[in-house]
């Protein structure tokens, strides 16, 4: 596919590689556009960056690269959406300049040490893209559905088997739920979406889930389908079905999405820029210094009313100080563009623009890259 935008040529290759090249001469600095509050983009360094990794941030990366080439004409970034694991491996092997990943570097497998060896300095995990996960459903005659953590967990592990179960009905007063059997649909492929959804079930269910979390669905019930395309296609043809999808996909396919009742209050919360923004703003950081690893358990049991709790955070994994200074300069400029002008209209790409408070934390780390 090819997209035409003013001043830039954009192409998304079949292999999943995103390349954007701007027209025009070089520039030393560009101020952030509307919607970016993190300061100027200081252009420079090598002309072409290479990155790979998370498919969940592929759409956001299109917006980030567009912002980069607009801010720094003549500079490019090539992003290969080949999956988080592959992206981290390529970064550790010094095949790319930074990685996109659904999870931070894993100390239990020695990844931070390997990254420090590759970089000649500590690597930093910078949470840059946040995407809500929607609980989607197809129940004939039902257009509004409220769920909470314990009830959702019991649905996805098979403890609750019909839609008019008293535990579901108690959350949906005024809605006549049918006795239709519940058909759970899950991702049959390994998926960061499955991992994060099950972390929500584990963290928000008061022990009702009991299955742990991994990239493989652990619920033990239901029918599997590959990818968002597979699960949504099966959902749309199966009355009584329920699954989980990335928000952008649920919106694009016009799927019904449940509202979530959280630990912060009795009012059900829908996915909006505001509700997910509250979650991001309240995120707790457990990394040290500029290594901004998040404690995502703070998402699942929010304390602020109106926070949507099921959110996938994805990271850009960068060197704090690159062996080649020209690479460090370019990576810093790209990240400045991503968290500045790249935030404008990001919700149109299925991700949530960074709240100003979190944007400021991220900017301090980004500006320290060298």
From Swiss-Prot:
Q: Can you tell which superkingdom this protein's organism belongs to?
A: Bacteria
**Binding-site positions, phosphate:** 54-56, 84, 102, 191-193
Q: Answer yes or no on keyword Transport.
A: yes
Q: Which cysteines are joined by disulfide bonds?
A: none
Task: Kindly give the membrane topology term recorded for this protein.
Answer: Lipid-anchor
UniProt GO MF annotations = phosphate ion binding
Q: Where does the signal peptide begin and end?
A: 1-22
Q: How does it assemble?
A: The complex is composed of two ATP-binding proteins (PstB), two transmembrane proteins (PstC and PstA) and a solute-binding protein (PstS).
NCBIfam families with a match to the protein in the record: 3a0107s03 (TIGR00975)
Similarity comment: family membership: Belongs to the PstS family.
Q: What is the name listed in the Swiss-Prot or TrEMBL entry for this protein?
A: Phosphate-binding protein PstS2
GN (gene name): pstS2
